């Protein structure tokens, strides 16, 4: 059975790169009816926090990436790592290193001055006796030959063993190192495939040798391409890439972000929009590219707008509620008629790219009054238009059935009686009702806003003019 894992370090929030790695592992597990395991790699105690662990888990849940086992925490397994490290030491596959951090740094600086790679010089490797000094445990790398990583994405990648230093597996304070913990955990958790960013590729030969030294078979490795900004620089906040939960708070749909992340390095023909079921069905590592993926914030925004169009109004109603409350358009605990709200959303969703934009647009259906944009006010609320607004108001007030058809008839009657163009009647009303010159059809806006709100808003502007 396929068993994969996502193993974030809780030294920050879950960002785009980590979320993409989590998604690829999740899709691979679901495609193969396997298991997806969540492991928290929290051995860096100085930087790992409970807040970040909670944030990562919240982001995973929001993305819908459910896990089958875990979350496991490395800090709960420290004695396990120590036991494996001492096993290697006893078998002569590792050795005690008595070099102090100061000595190591001094030699590193000297090597750099001489133009040599700043690697550990293995001076403690041949010390036979046990000294009464603090020590770290280093793994004995082979001194000759090559290590070939047969990567499922990159193909065969060869490393010279002589260029790989004897890495520390247990520090002098008794804490294990990343490369060692990963091997022990992946073996004990039965991981069959390690899918991770290509920045981990250089760790792979070290890990393979630790597997062999422990008498374990390494899993399959798949190193997925880096994500770059549109300027081909390493992805950062300046490219618009923020934490997963920031996208949630800005009004992105989780399905849209999942779709976007899936396409960062993986493709299926020219298809752009996938349901989760389709992603699970089509995903495989053969179609993960070798070239770096490019993060395009505009593309994500476009994709989100497409998802808003595709999402049923009933679901959008539930999703937009927190934004309406946050913006102050709806009070906590206040209820809206669902059918009415769905009509309002249907009229607006084609024009909105995020839930935040949708909530903002809904203000002119929910508030008694809206703020009018200065330029729109200057152009459409003046001595020429106020008489038209007054006549529209009088005729609308007389309507018994406040429907689009009846509203349209009133507008057309005024157009014909006064010899005006439709825009000369509709635009001033639109500006009063929405605060803007752009909106859904004006008859639809009035019908959804309702007679009371419409008249209240029109009379307020007329009285103030």
UniProtKB/Swiss-Prot annotation:
NCBIfam families with a match to the protein in the record: gltX_bact
Pfam families reported for this sequence: Anticodon_2, tRNA-synt_1c
Binding site for ATP: 237
Top enzyme category: ligase
PROSITE patterns listed in its UniProt record: AA_TRNA_LIGASE_I
GO biological process, one term: glutamyl-tRNA aminoacylation
GO cellular component: cytosol
Reactions mediated catalytically: tRNA(Glu) + L-glutamate + ATP = L-glutamyl-tRNA(Glu) + AMP + diphosphate
Subunit structure as annotated in this protein's UniProt entry: Monomer.
Cofactor note: Binds 1 zinc ion per subunit.
Predominant cellular place of this UniProt entry's protein: cytoplasm
Cofactor(s) listed: Zn(2+)
Family the entry assigns: Belongs to the class-I aminoacyl-tRNA synthetase family. Glutamate--tRNA ligase type 1 subfamily.
Record HAMAP family: Glu_tRNA_synth_type1
GO molecular function terms noted in the UniProt entry: ATP binding; glutamate-tRNA ligase activity; tRNA binding; zinc ion binding
UniProt-recorded name of the protein: Glutamate--tRNA ligase
Annotated positions binding Zn(2+): 97, 99, 124, 126
EC number: 6.1.1.17
Keyword match Nucleotide-binding: yes
